Regions:
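NAD(P)-dependent Rossmann-like dehydrogenase/reductase catalytic/cofactor-binding core
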Residues: 43-127
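Active-site-proximal catalytic alpha-helix in oxidoreductases
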Residues: 5-33, 37-50
C-alpha cells in the first residue's frame, strides 16, 4: 500500500487498545464490552491513540475510532490477544513496544492521553 504509516498505526491502535484493556481489566473481550467502565476506557484509548497518530500527520481513515469500536463490539466473543495470553501465562508484556509507542508519540506532540497513560502505568509493571 502507499501509506504504510497509516496501516501500521491502524493496526497498532487496534492491537494496543484491545490487548491492553483485556490485561488491565483481566477480562476477555466479551466481558470488557459488557462493563461500562472498561468499555469507556477502551473507547477513549482508541480516540487518544488516533489523535496521537494525527499529531504526526498520519492520514488515518475517517471515522476510524467509531469503526474500530464497532469492529470490537461485533467480534468481542472471538477476539484474541497475544498480550492477554502473555498476561495469563505470567510472561513479560510487550506493552512498552505497543501501547508505549503510541503514548510516547502523543505526549511528545501535546496530545492529552489520560486513559492510555493510566493503563500503561498499570501494565508496565508486568513488562
Amino acid at each position: 500500500t502507499e501509506d504504510i504509516g497509516k496501516d501500521v498505526w491502524e493496526k497498532l491502535i487496534m492491537v494496543a487498545a484491545i490487548g491492553s484493556i483485556m490485561c488491565y481489566s483481566n477480562m476477555p473481550a466479551k466481558e470488557v464490552v459488557k462493563n461500562k467502565n472498561y468499555l469507556n476506557i477502551l473507547k477513549e484509548m482508541i480516540i487518544e491513540m488516533e489523535n496521537a497518530s494525527i499529531s504526526i500527520n498520519v492520514n488515518i481513515k475517517k471515522n476510524y475510532s467509531k469503526n474500530t469500536l464497532d469492529y470490537i463490539l461485533g467480534r468481542a466473543d472471538e477476539l484474541h490477544s497475544s498480550l492477554k495470553e502473555d498476561f495469563d501465562n505470567k510472561r513479560p508484556l510487550e506493552v512498552d513496544e505497543i501501547l508505549g509507542e503510541a503514548l510516547r508519540t502523543g505526549l511528545k506532540n501535546n496530545v492529552n492521553m489520560p486513559n492510555c497513560k493510566k493503563v500503561y502505568d498499570e501494565l508496565i509493571k508486568y513488562a
